[in-house]
Design a protein with these regions (language model features):
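Short, flexible beta-strand-to-coil junctions
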Residues: 95-97, 140, 206
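Small-aliphatic-rich amphipathic alpha-helix that forms the alpha element of a beta-alpha
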Residues: 45, 64, 91, 133-144, ...
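Bacterial Sec-dependent N-terminal signal peptides
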Residues: 1-21
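N-terminal amphipathic, basic helical "cap/leader" segment at the start of enzyme domains
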Residues: 20-131
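Short secondary-structure capping/junction motifs at helix and strand boundaries
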Residues: 2-4, 16, 75-77, 175-176
Length: 211
């Protein structure tokens, strides 16, 4: 019992130290005037599995995250609708140096864990590991107050809406992506410090098209 307690303390301290190695990334203000028209973006949308090794430009990352689930009104409502405005979808950005949680109110990336977890997102599908970043979508079931099947269904719908925003925004911004359900759930759940009331549902590797 004592040994288990001290092991937990050591692990927690290790996670805190890892997160402290990273800094908050304050994103640029989103450029809401750029990108192609909605109909053109929908026409261009496609699933892409080959990515350039080029790092995502800061403005592209900022605009993509805002389009996916950013705040677009003074009352704090989002670009993606959600069940009863629960705003239950969390976006984790997995970069080579570490994983971050997107804070929509601050329009910033908050450090979660240092280290490259793109392999855990790829989970054996090598093409996904070649993307310079992946966005992992998680449903926060505490917003529903229960883990019923109907609540999980609504949460999955909310995640799907954010995922579609990512797909369309990538098409409009000249980025490449593909929505995926495959990922190493156990590794990511530990790395991202997700409680049992968080559902890991979808991920989107993102990069520039290889060609």
């Amino acid at each position: 019992m004592v040994r288990t307690f001290f092991t937990s303390v050591i692990l927690l301290a290790s996670y805190c130290i890892q997160a402290q190695e990273l800094s908050v990334i304050q994103l640029n203000a989103p450029d809401k005037t750029r990108g192609s028209a909605v109909m053109k973006a929908l026409d261009d949308r496609q699933s892409v599995r080959e990515f350039s090794s080029e790092t995502i430009k800061p403005q592209d990352l900022s605009d993509l995250l805002w389009a996916a689930n950013g705040i677009n009104r003074p009352d704090g409502k989002r670009t993606a609708p959600s069940c009863r405005n629960f705003q239950d979808v969390e976006m984790y950005v997995v970069l080579p140096e570490g994983a971050y949680l997107y804070d929509a109110r601050e329009h910033a990336l908050k450090p979660v864990v240092a280290g490259d977890y793109r392999s855990a997102v790829a989970s054996g599908q090598e093409f996904a590991k070649t993307a310079p970043l992946s966005i992992v979508l998680v449903a926060d079931m505490t917003k529903y107050g229960n883990m019923s099947e109907s609540s999980k269904l609504m949460a999955a719908i909310d995640v799907g809406i954010v995922c579609q925003n990512i797909n369309v925004a990538c098409a409009g911004l000249g980025l490449a992506t593909v929505p995926r359900g495959t990922m190493d759930q156990a590794t990511l759940r530990t790395a991202l410090k997700l409680a049992d009331n968080r559902l890991l549902l979808i991920n989107n590797p993102v990069g520039y098209p290889k060609n």
